[in-house]
């Protein structure tokens, strides 16, 4: 890996100089001066997905400098290292091989002198057989009833990803009721337990380490609830399953060895939905659809690995993101899926991006003096239009946005979808081109308002535009297309981290909070005043404990 701070490259200097020249150019002018702009700045993926990046504040020259940056930092070598199984997660001495989980060609991937595809395929076969038994009613609970409810207990990547996908692919859902429990707040589990019957429910305990406090706490409470009804320890074998890399801890919990679906330390938690952590997805949509989901991701993997810099979708989107965060000074990026089934898509990539690239130390162990990962947020359209779009249109911040929509809806109720898509097109147009003073003035005059009213209202109606967007149009949200879309964003995150010279696959910041919370939890059980914390934490703890007397 090239451990170069990107602001020490010639490409960075070129971009810095170039930025001074174009920073005030409006998108209106960029489109007016180039009638081929859309054609040049858009890519179609497999005739299923259109990526339009023409409404970005870039020129041909910008793109040349950005692509030079990718070449100078040698992104292609980084891609090859990841796909080969090199230990690019240096701080944990691990490979990063979620791509192996969707390697549909079965190309051998050698790790520690072993072809890991043999284990991957064996796991997939085990998941297939189990899911078919559950879906077809052949797997029975402790009283002989078929399974109707599936409860996935996990947090972070073991929850956000599977939950997002099962929601996005709800049109492909079978009869099983899917529930997801993540929060250590007892309310989350309690409300799910109210809805289910222990006789026809299975619990999937999804934790790579099988030590995550939230997950294991919820799992123990679910187990206690189940045993209260079954009164039979052996009944756990019909109802509790572990999705984990830690076989020993799963066995100690009471999981039958045959009920453990393993995954490996080379699968990062936030990329684990492709692994056994995605068992709930397979149970929801069936094995055949899960295979198509993997196929779509594999197709994007091939595009990412083989396509040149200039036409490589994840590379281009990553470069454009870096352009905004490090030159325009934008702090956030928004993701707006115009599809209600995809209502958790933004939240999933909030975690994937911010946990991956929320770093301030470079790969040489030195503090960074440039911006790394942006804040990711978003909601489905059109809800967001009536919540926070106002700030994007007329606020003081630059907020690059991704708009995602299907051409065909799964629920084309009357003309609902055409209205939805009309909003999609209108918002990207309005954000790019805005509404100038002259055009508003002309319309106000035509409306025959008096001069005083025009003068009073005119400044407030101006929308400056020049807000950048990417538009991703997908033929339909299918398992294949969703798989490709997720892989696209995953690879974008990798490229961003690689160029920014950070390690994208650890999360040491998360670990600190875990350690401190355990210390405080132990202390809360002691009925003495705290003397070892800062004044604020001590005050909070003492106020809490005053109610426990």
UniProtKB/Swiss-Prot annotation:
What is the superkingdom listed in this entry's lineage?
Answer: Bacteria
Q: What is its EC number?
A: 5.3.1.9
| Keyword Disulfide bond in record | no
Keywords of this protein's UniProt record, alphabetized? Cytoplasm, Gluconeogenesis, Glycolysis, Isomerase
The protein's name is: Glucose-6-phosphate isomerase
Catalysis: reaction(s):
alpha-D-glucose 6-phosphate = beta-D-fructose 6-phosphate
Q: Which residues form the signal peptide?
A: none
What residues make up the catalytic site? 355 (proton donor), 386, 514
- An MF annotation (GO) of this entry: carbohydrate derivative binding
Functional note: Catalyzes the reversible isomerization of glucose-6-phosphate to fructose-6-phosphate.
Q: Which family does it belong to?
A: Belongs to the GPI family.
Spell out the NCBIfam families in the cross-references: PRK00179.1
Q: What is a biological process (GO) this protein takes part in?
A: glucose 6-phosphate metabolic process
Can you say where in the cell this protein is located?
Answer: Cytoplasm
What Gene Ontology cellular component terms go with this record?
cytosol
Main localization is cytoplasm
Which pathway is recorded for this entry?
Carbohydrate biosynthesis; gluconeogenesis; Carbohydrate degradation; glycolysis; D-glyceraldehyde 3-phosphate and glycerone phosphate from D-glucose: step 2/4
């Amino acid at each position: 890996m090239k451990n170069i701070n990107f602001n020490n490259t010639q490409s960075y200097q070129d971009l810095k100089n170039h930025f001074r020249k174009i920073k005030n150019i409006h998108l209106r002018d960029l489109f007016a001066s180039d009638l081929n702009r859309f054609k040049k700045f858009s890519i179609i993926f497999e005739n299923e997905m259109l990526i339009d990046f023409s409404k970005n504040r870039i020129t041909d020259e910008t793109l040349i400098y950005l692509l030079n940056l990718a070449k100078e930092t040698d992104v292609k070598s980084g891609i090859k290292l990841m796909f080969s199984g090199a230990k690019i997660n240096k701080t944990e001495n691990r490979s990063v091989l979620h791509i192996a989980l969707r390697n549909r060609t079965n190309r051998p991937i050698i790790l520690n002198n072993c072809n890991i595809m043999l284990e991957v395929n064996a796991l997939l076969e085990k998941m297939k057989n189990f899911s078919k038994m559950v879906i077809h009613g052949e797997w029975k609970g402790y009283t002989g009833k078929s399974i109707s409810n599936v409860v996935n207990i996990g947090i972070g990547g073991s929850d956000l990803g599977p939950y997002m996908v099962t929601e996005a692919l709800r049109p492909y859902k079978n009869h099983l009721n899917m529930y997801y429990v993540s929060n250590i707040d007892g309310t989350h589990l309690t409300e799910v337990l109210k809805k289910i019957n222990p006789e026809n429910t299975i619990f999937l305990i999804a934790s790579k380490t099988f030590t995550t406090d939230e997950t294991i706490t919820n799992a123990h409470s679910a187990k206690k609830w189940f045993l209260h009804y079954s009164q039979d320890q052996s009944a756990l074998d019909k109802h509790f399953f572990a999705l984990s890399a830690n076989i020993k801890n799963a066995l100690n919990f009471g999981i039958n060895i045959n009920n453990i679906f393993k995954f490996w330390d080379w699968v990062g938690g936030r990329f684990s939905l492709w692994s056994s952590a995605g068992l709930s997805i397979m149970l929801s949509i069936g094995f055949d659809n899960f295979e198509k989901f993997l196929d779509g991701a594999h197709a994007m993997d091939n595009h990412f690995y083989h396509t040149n810099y200039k036409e490589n979708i994840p590379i281009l989107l990553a470069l454009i993101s870096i352009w905004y965060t490090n030159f325009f000074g934008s702090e956030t990026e928004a993701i707006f899926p115009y599809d209600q089934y995809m209502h958790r898509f933004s939240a999933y990539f909030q975690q994937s991006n911010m946990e991956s690239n929320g770093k301030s130390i470079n790969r040489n162990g030195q503090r960074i003096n440039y911006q790394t990962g942006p804040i990711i947020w978003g909601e489905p359209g059109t809800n967001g239009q009536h919540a926070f779009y106002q700030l994007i249109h007329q606020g003081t911040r630059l907020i690059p946005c991704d708009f995602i929509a299907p051409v065909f809806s799964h629920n084309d109720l009357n003309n609902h979808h055409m209205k939805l898509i009309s909003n999609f097109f209108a918002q990207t147009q309005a954000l790019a081109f805005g509404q100038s003073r002259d055009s508003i003035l002309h319309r106000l005059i035509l409306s025959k308002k008096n001069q005083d009213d025009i003068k009073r209202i005119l400044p407030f109606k101006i929308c400056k535009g020049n807000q950048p967007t990417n538009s991703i149009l997908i033929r339909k949200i299918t398992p294949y297309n969703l798989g490709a879309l997720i892989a696209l964003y995953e690879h974008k995150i990798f490229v961003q981290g690689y160029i920014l010279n950070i390690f994208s696959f650890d999360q040491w910041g998360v670990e600190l909070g875990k350690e401190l919370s355990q210390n405080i939890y132990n202390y809360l059980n002691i009925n003495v005043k705290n003397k070892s914390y800062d004044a604020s934490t001590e005050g909070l703890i003492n106020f809490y404990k005053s109610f426990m007397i």
